[in-house]
Amino acid sequence: MAMSLPQLGGAGGAHTQPSLPSLPAHLQSDTHLTAHLASRFHVSHPTARLSSHALISLNTYTNSSKGPDGGKEGSAMAGAEDIADRAFLRLGHRSENQAIVFLGESGAGKSTIRAHLLTALLNKSSTPLSTKLSLAAYVFDSLTTTKTATTPTASKSGLFYELQYDTSATTNPILIGGKLLDHRLERSRIADVPTGERNFHVLYYLLAGTSEAEKSHLGLDGGSGAAGTTQKRWKYLGHPTQLKVGINDAEGFQVFKNALRKLEFPRAEIAEICQILASILHIGQLEFETTSQTSVTGDDSGGFSHEGGTTVTAVKNKDVLSIVAAFLGVSSADLQTTLGYKTKMIHRERVTVMLDPNGARAHAGELARTLYSLLVAWILETINQRLCAPEESIANTVSIVDFPGFCQQTPTGSALDQLLNNAATESIYNLTLQNFFDRKADMLESEEVSVAATSYFDNSDAVRGILKPGNGLLSILDDQTRRNRTDMQFLEALRRRFDGKNAAIEVGSAQAKLPGSNFLTENTSACFTVKHFAGEVDYPVKGLIEENSEVISGDLLNMINGTKSEFVARLFGQDALQTVTHPTERTTVMQATVSSKPMRAPSVMSRKTTRAGRPSTAHRRQQQEALEELDRESQVGESNKKNANMTPEQGASGQFLASLDNLQKAVTDPGTNSYFIFCLKPNDRRIANQFDSKCVRMQVQTFGIAEISQRLRSADFSLFLPFGEFLGLTDSETILVGSERERAEMVIEEKQWPQNEVRVGATGVFLSERCWMEIAQLGEAVSVGGRYGGLHSSDAGDGLTPAESIPYGVSKENLVSGGNTPLMYGEKSKGGYFTDDNRSEAGVSAFGGGDMFKNLDTREQMAERGNEKSLEEVEEYRDKPSRKRWVALVYFLTWFIPDFAVRVIGRMSRKDVRMAWREKVAINMLIWLMCAVAAFFMVGFPMLICPKQYVYSSGELSSYDGEKGSKGAYVAIRGFVIDLENFIPNHYPGSDLVSETTLMKYAGKDITSLFPVQVSALCQGKDGAIPPEVTLDNRNTNMTGQPQLLAQRDVDVNSVYHDFRYGTNDSRPDWYFEQMYTFKHVYLKGRMGYTPKYVEKLARDSAWNIVTIHGKVYDMTKYMQGGLRMKTKPGEATPNIPGATDFMEDSVVQLFRSAKGQDVSKYWDNIKLSAVKKQRMETCLNNLFYIGDSDTRNSTRCQFAEYFILAISVLLASILVFKFLAALQFGGKNVPENLDKFVMCMIPAYTEDEDSLRRAIDSLSRMKYDDKRKLLVVVCDGMIIGQGNDRPTPRIVLDILGVSETVDPEPLSFEALGEGMKQHNMGKIYSGLYEVQGHIVPFMVIVKVGKPSEVARPGNRGKRDSQMVLMRFLNRVHYNLAMSPMELEMYHQIRNIIGVNPTFYEYLFQIDADTVVAPDSATRMISAFIDDTRLIACCGETALTNAKGSFITMIQVYEYWISHNLSKAFESLFGSVTCLPGCFSMYRIRAAETGKPLFVSKEIVEDYSTIRVDTLHMKNLLHLGEDRYLTTLLLKYHGKYKTKYLYSAQAWTIAPDSWAVFLSQRRRWINSTVHNLVELIPLAELCGFCCFSMRFVVFVDLLSTIVQPVIVMYIVYLIYQVASNPSVVPITAFLLLGAIYGLQAIIFILRRKWEMVGWMIMYIAAIPVFSFGLPLYSFWHMDDFNWGNTRVIAGESGKKIVVSDEGKFDPNSIPRKKWEEYQAELWETQTQTARDDVRSEISGYSYATKAQGPFSDYHGGYQPSRPGSTAGFGHPNMSRMSLAHSEMPGNRASQFGGSQFFSPEEMVGMPSDDALLAEIRDILKTADLMTVTKKGIKQELERRFNVPLDAKRAYINSATEALLSGQL
C-alpha cells in the first residue's frame, strides 16, 4: 500500500511541510532533515513535527512567541500549546495519564518551551490553583536555574512536575493539585561557581532586590549600589560581571517574594528564607588562617607542646562570622570551632580532623551546600504540602519531565554531578527510543500485525551498564561507598564487572608509569569511560567515592542541634536530611546526608471504578495492575522515610538510581501516554537567527531523529482500540452486516487513512492520534494552519485571563535577553507561567514598606539568643571566707568601674566573666602598686630622703677651669655658679676690650670682686633707705678652697668695667641686679656649697662671722670688721651721716657674732623684729652677704638612703651568689649501678606528628634501664587528626608500636575531667611488647575515644585529664578502692598480660610527646630517689632540639639553660623546686619504706582533679600551669619531702618557633607562676633559716616576677642618666648587673659551654621582651580563657549554684568494683581450660556503661578487649611473650566480634544478639553436626532475617563455637 501521508503544510515551498515523516524517503537522512529544518528556520518556522506526539523546536534566541507573521502561529510557543492541547484532550476523553518529556542540550530552550507548555495547561483550568502551580514553577526555577556559558536559564535540577486532575465525572478534567519532584540539584555549584557562569538565580535576586534596610539587616550593604549592583566581590556569586548579565534580578526578587506569599508562606518564613540565603553568601566570604589557640578552653588543660597553644584554623573576619552565626541561631565561637574541625568515620572509628585553612574553606562550603539543599528541599516540600491533592482523589496526572541536558564536561569539577546528570539523560533517551521503537512491538506481534523493521542506534548497553540494579555502574558506586572502599578499589570493581562484558563502559588502569620511570605507580588520573548516546565521557574516579557519600559531618549537625532558630531547626529536621544514628544511642546523630531523590513519588491512578460507559478491557486491567504495583512501591518509599534510620542508607548514586527508576516506571507505564519535545539549538554561539548546519546535524544524529522519522513512516500508532470501542466511536449504524473486524475494515477503507497510521489487528485497531481524533469527531477543533492543535474544550471560554497577560518573562521566549530584561527571562507583559489572581494582595503588601524584617528580631538579638546556652544546675556550694575577703577587696579596688560599662562596652554578658575581669584589673592594680613601690624605692626613696643638690664646693668649682680635659668653664659670683663658657660668646662689649682668653682665665674661680655692688640698690637697711655713697668690700675664694680676704690693692683691674656705683661717672644703681638676673635665668649651673663642718671650721679657725640659715650660708665678716665706707663722686664732699654704714639691725649682727659657724635657723625664726624689718634684713642678707648653700650630700641622711638601697642590692646579689654556688656542681657523671625498681614511663599524646611521637617513644624504650622493669604508658587524648597528619594520633601511636588495625578492644567507661556529662568518658586499652634496637619494652596505650554521643573531638579532655587517668588508677590501686571498667581493664592488662602487679611500680616518669630523653636519664633519677628516700620528685635539665629554628627559638636557648642551672639548682639546695616541668620529671608513687601513697595520695588526686574551675585564680592554676600546680600540691601536702633538680639527667624538647605560640606559652608560665607562688607563700613547711628560708626565696621570686617591667625601666633610666650626665655613673648598679651576667658566664665557661656566649648575647638583646613586654601582656591577659558553658549564679542564703549546658553528671552511670570482686567473678565465669585470659563478659558488660543495657546479656554489641600479646594473633612487633606467669587462667582471645563504632550501614536494622543466638540454637537442633558449617549457618540466618549479616559474622562464628563446645 503506497504511503500517502497528509500534506498539512498547505501550498508553498518545501519549508511549508511541518511533518518530517511526510517528507519523501530520499530526504529522510540526517543531512536532508537538517536542510529541511534550516529552510523552515529561515522563514521563521522554528518547529517541526515527527508525529502527533513528538515536536522538534529550534531555539531562535529571539522571542519564542512570535511566528513568521508576527503572531503566535508557527512559533515555538504555538507548538508547545499544541502539545498541551493534545495532552489535555486525551486526558479528558480517555482518562489516560499524560507525560511530556523534554530532550535537548543545554541552551536548546527546554526551559522556555516548558514554560509555554505549563502555561497552556494551566490556562485550561478555572481554579485559582493554577496560579499557585504557576508560581510554584517560578519558585522552582528561581532556586534551581542558573546562567551558564550556553544559556542564561540553565536548569540544574531534574524536574518531574505533576499536575493532578479529577477525570471521573466529565471529559473536561478538573485540576485538583500539583506536585514538584526535584531530582538531584547540582549542589557543587553553590560553593564553586564556574568561571563565566552564575550561581543559582535566587542568590542574585536577594542581593539586587532587597531594600537598603533589608540589606543592612542581612549584612549585604557593603558598597551596594542603587541599581542592584555592588562593588563587593561575593565568592559564591562568581565574578562581579555576573551581576550584570541582562537579567533584572531586582524585579525577580520581588516576584519571588510575592510568589512565596501567594503560596501561603508566612511573612516570617519568607524573612527566614532570605536570612538563610544571606548566610550562604556570607559563608562564602569567610576567610581562614592558621593560628595558635592561645585561649584555654574549659575542658582543655593545655600542656601539649609546651603549653604554647594548639595550631588551629580560625576565621579572620569575625564580623562576617557573627552574621552567619546570628542567622543560624548558634554562637560565633561554636561556628568557628565547628568549621575548624571535621569528624569522620575512619576504619569504624569516629575521628576528628583538625583542618587547615583550605580544609576549613571546604568545610564551610559543605555547610553552604547543606543549607541551600535543605532550604530548596524544604521550600519544595512545603509547596507540595499545600498544592498536592490526596492520593485517593487523583484520577489522572499530566507529568512534565525536564532534566538538564547532556554534559560533556563538568564546569564545577564535580564528576558525580556529571555522571548522574548524564545517567538521567541516557535513561530519558532510552525510554524515548522504547516509546518509538519497542513499546508496542509485543502487542503488534500478539495482534498479528507486521511492521517493517527500522534500524536505529540502541543505547541499551549504556543504560544497562549504568542503571542496572545490583551490578550497574551506579549500583556498584553505591555499594562501594557503603563498604567504605577507596577510589582505586571502586575502579577495580568496575573492571571486574565490565571488562569484556559491556561495550559501553571502558575502565582505565589504576596504575601507570610516570615519565622517566620503569615502575608502576598509582594512576592519579585514573578514570572510566562511558560511551553515551551523545558521545564518550571520561569520568575521573579520584574523590568519587567520598563525593558520592555526601556525608554531612556530625560537627555541623551537633552545632545545629543547639540552634536557637526554630526555622533552622525545621530545615534540619525534615525528611530530606537522612541521619545516621549510633547503634547504641539512637539520640546520637553520627552523620547525615541530604537526599538526592524527591521526597515524594509520582502519583498513581485512583482505584475508583471507571466511568460508566467506558470500555473495560484486558489492556486497561493490565494498566491498572501496573499502577497498583507502582503505588505499592511509592507507599513503601513513604514508609521507608519514616524508618530511615532503621535501614541501610544509600549514597547519592543509589538514591538517584531509585528516583530514576520511579520516573521511568511512571513514564513508561502502559496507562501513560507520552509526548516528546526535542529542543535543538541552531548554533553554539547563541546568535539569533543563525543556523549552523553542522551543529544542528550533530543534534539530529545524536537524538536519532532520522531513524525515528523513518520508523514513524511505517508505524505511527498512538492508541489501540478493541473493535467494539472503535466501532462505538464511528458512525457504523449503516453497516449492518459483517463481523466487528469486517465492519472496522470497512470504516478504515472509507476513511482512506495512510497505512502507517492505522492497522487492523486480531482483536482491535491500532490508530494514530490524528485518526483517533477524526473518528472521535474531535477533528473540527483543529485550528487552521495545519497543526494538530488548538483543541480547546468546550470550557475554553471560561473567562480565564489569556496567556498574553501573564507575567513571567520573555525568558521562556527569549533566552538571550537583549537588555535589562525583567526577571531572569524577559518582559513582564509577555506570556509565561503566571495568570492573574484576583485574590486580595493584602498579604503581599506587607512587603511594601521596604523592610520585610520590620517588627522581627534584629540581627543583634539573634546573635544574643544564639550565644545563650541551655543551662542545668549541676552543683551547689558556698564561698570560702578567703574568697569572700578577696571579692570584697576586688570590688573595693574597682568600685569606680560600673558593671554596666563592663557588660556593654566590654561585651561580657556573663557575671563570672565580668568578675574575672574585675579580678584581673584588681590584680593588675596591685601589681602596678608593687611596681610603683619598687620604682619608688629605687628612684624616689633616695630622692625623698636625700633630695638632689646642685651645689659645688670650691674644689669642685676649680675643676671647671676650662682647660683641656676639664668638664667645662664655671665661675662663682656671690654664691651662684655661672656657666662662663656659654656666656663668653655673649659678653659685651666683646673681645676688643677684654679678650676671650682673658675671660677664660677666670674659669674655676670666684669672681665676686669683679662685680661691685650698689648697696642702696640691693638693701633698704633698718629704716628703708641707705645713702647711695655707702660701699661694701668684696670677698673672693681662692682655688684651694681656702677663703681669703682681699685687700684693696688686690681688687681685679677688670672690675672697673663693672663698677657703676654712685661714686663713678656712670652711675647705674640697678646694673648689678639686672646682670645677675640674666646670669641666674640663663647661665646658672648651681650654687656654691659649704658643708656644716667647713662652715664651723671657717668660723673657728679664720674668725669668719658666717652662719647657716635654712640651708643658706651668709658671711658678714667684712661688714662686722668695718668693711663699709662712703664713696662720693669726684669733686663732691663726703656727707657726714651718723650710722649710715651701720644699716643692719644690731640683733642680726649680734646673731652672727654670737653663733658664728652654726645653723641659726631656729634663732632667726625667733628673732625679735617686726615682719617688715625682718623682711628687709632677709633681703639684705640674700643680696649682699649670701655666699652659697649648705652642702648635705655627705650627711647621715643621704648616706642612709644610699646604703639602704645598697643593702637590698647586696641581699639580692647574695641570692644570686648562692644560685651561682648551687650551679657549680663539678665532677663527672657517675654511672649508677643497675637498678631493679619498676617505673612507669608516661607520654600524653594529642596531635603530635609521627616523627615526634616515634622519637619520644623510642627514646624511652632505648633508655639504659632494665626493659622488663619499665612500662610505656601512652595516653592518647581523643580521636583527632592533627594538621599535617594523615591518621588520628592513636592510630599513629599504635602503628609505631606495631598494633594491627584488626585489634579493636571494647571502649570502657571511666571518670574524666570535664563539664557536666563530659565527666563520663570512654577509652580503649591496648598492650603488648615494643621492640626497637634490641630493646623489648612492655607498653600500654590508653585511647580516650569518648562516649558514642560525642561528635566533635571525641574523647578529648586535655593533658591534666590524661595525667589523672594514671594518677586516679594508681590511687585506687594503692588504696584498694573500687575501679571503673577501664581501670579494671588497665589492672588486668598490667597484671595478667604484662605480668607485673601494678603495686610494684614505684616511680612515674613523665615526658611530653615532643621530648627526647637521654639514655641514662631514668637511671640517674631513680638513683637519686634511692639515695634520698625523702625525695618525692625530681626533674632534669631540658634543652632545645630546635635551637636554630627561628629567632624566637634562639632567644630561648640561654633562658632555658640558665633557668635550670641557676634557678632550679638554687631551689634544689633547699629541696623545694617549685616547678617540675611536665615535659621531663619523675615522681615517687609510694614511699619506699611504708608503701604509703605519695604522688597519688588522696589529697593530691582530689585537689588536682578539681572540676569546678570557675575563678580566675583556679583557672590560672589548673588551666595554665597544671605542672607547676602539681608541684605546689606536692610541697603543700608532703612538706617533709623534697623536690630536686638533677643537672646530670638531660632531655631535649621543642620550643615555640612562632611569636603567637611563644607569647601564649609565656603568658601561661608567668601567670601560673604568680598564682602558684601565692599558693606557696602561706605554707609553713617550707624549709630554711633566717632570711634564706625557702619562703623568702619564693617571695623574692614572686616579687621579681611582678616587678620585672620596673627593673627594665630602671635599667633604661640608668642608661639615660649615664648618657645625659656622664659625670654621674651609678657604679653600684652596673656592678650588680655585671655580677649577674658575669657569674652566669663563669658557670658556662667552667662547664665549657662556649656556645652559650652567643646565646647569652641574644638573650640580653631580648631582655625587653622577656622582662617587659611578656609580663605586661601576661598580666593584662590573665583572664584570657574560653570560659566554656559552665557558670556560677547566686543562690539562696549565700550559696552558689553551678549551671552547665553539658547536663548533670551522675557518678552512678559509671559502675565501679574492686579488683578482688572483679577477679572472683572473672574466675567464676571462666572455664577451667588452659586458655589465654581476656576480659570476662562481666567486666565488659555488667560494668560497662548503662547505655549498653538494651543489648544481650551475653556479649552485648561490643567485642571484649583483646590483649596485645601475639599469642593467638601473631601480629608483628607486638606481644611475643608474657613478662611473668599469669595469675589468671587463659585467654579466649576475643571471640565475640564487633566494635564500638560499627559502620552505620552494617548496624542499623540488624537483629539483636539474642535473636541470633536463639535462631542458631534452633538451626543446630535439626542440623547434621557432621556436615554443618559456619558459613551455612550464616546463610540460613540471612534467609530467615532477610538481611545481610556480614557485620555479625564474628559473633555468629563465636556463638556457634560456644554452643557446640557446651559453653552456652
UniProtKB/Swiss-Prot annotation:
Main location: membrane
Compartments it resides in: Cell membrane
Coiled coil: none
Record EC number: 2.4.1.16
SMART domains in UniProt: Cyt-b5 (SM01117), MYSc (SM00242)
Transmembrane segment boundaries: 886-906, 925-945, 1204-1224, 1592-1612, 1625-1645, 1652-1672
Catalysed conversion reaction: [(1->4)-N-acetyl-beta-D-glucosaminyl](n) + UDP-N-acetyl-alpha-D-glucosamine = [(1->4)-N-acetyl-beta-D-glucosaminyl](n+1) + UDP + H(+)
Binding site for ATP: G104, E105, S106, G107, A108, G109, K110, S111
Gene induction: Exhibits higher expression levels in hyphae than in germinating conidia. Expression is increased in the absence of chitin synthase CHS2.
Boundaries of every Cytochrome b5 heme-binding domain copy: 949-1011
Region of interest (Actin-binding), residue spans: 660-684
Keywords per UniProt: Actin-binding, ATP-binding, Cell membrane, Glycoprotein, Glycosyltransferase, Membrane, Motor protein, Myosin, Nucleotide-binding, Transferase, Transmembrane, Transmembrane helix
Cellular component aspect of the GO annotation: cell septum; myosin complex; plasma membrane
Glycosylation sites per record: N63, N123, N430, N484, N523, N561, N838, N1038, N1065, N1194, N1461, N1567, N1773
SUPFAM superfamilies membership: Cytochrome b5-like heme/steroid binding domain (SSF55856), DEK C-terminal domain (SSF109715), Nucleotide-diphospho-sugar transferases (SSF53448), P-loop containing nucleoside triphosphate hydrolases (SSF52540)
Gene Ontology BP term (one): fungal-type cell wall organization
Consequence of gene loss (knockout): Reduces mycelia growth rate, fails to produce perithecia, and shows drastically reduced virulence on barley heads.
Gene3D superfamilies, A to Z: 1.10.10.820, 1.20.58.530, Cytochrome b5-like heme/steroid binding domain, Homeodomain-like, Kinesin motor domain, Myosin VI head, motor domain, U50 subdomain, Spore Coat Polysaccharide Biosynthesis Protein SpsA, Chain A
Myosin motor domain sequence ranges: 1-780
Cross-referenced InterPro entries: Chitin_synth, Cyt_B5-like_heme/steroid-bd, Cyt_B5-like_heme/steroid_sf, DEK_C, Kinesin_motor_dom_sf, Myosin_head_motor_dom-like, MYSc_Myo17, Nucleotide-diphossugar_trans
Start and end residues of each DEK-C domain: 1806-1861
Start and end residues of each stretch annotated as Disordered: 1-26, 592-650
Protein family (similarity comment): In the N-terminal section; belongs to the TRAFAC class myosin-kinesin ATPase superfamily. Myosin family. In the C-terminal section; belongs to the chitin synthase family. Class VI subfamily.
Function: Polymerizes chitin, a structural polymer of the cell wall and septum, by transferring the sugar moiety of UDP-GlcNAc to the non-reducing end of the growing chitin polymer. Shows additive effects in septum formation with CHS1, CHS2, CHS3, CHS4, CHS6 and CHS7. Indispensable for perithecia formation and regulates conidiation. Plays an important role in the response to cell wall stress. Also required for hyphal growth and pathogenicity.
Protein name: Chitin synthase 5
Source species: Gibberella zeae (strain ATCC MYA-4620 / CBS 123657 / FGSC 9075 / NRRL 31084 / PH-1)
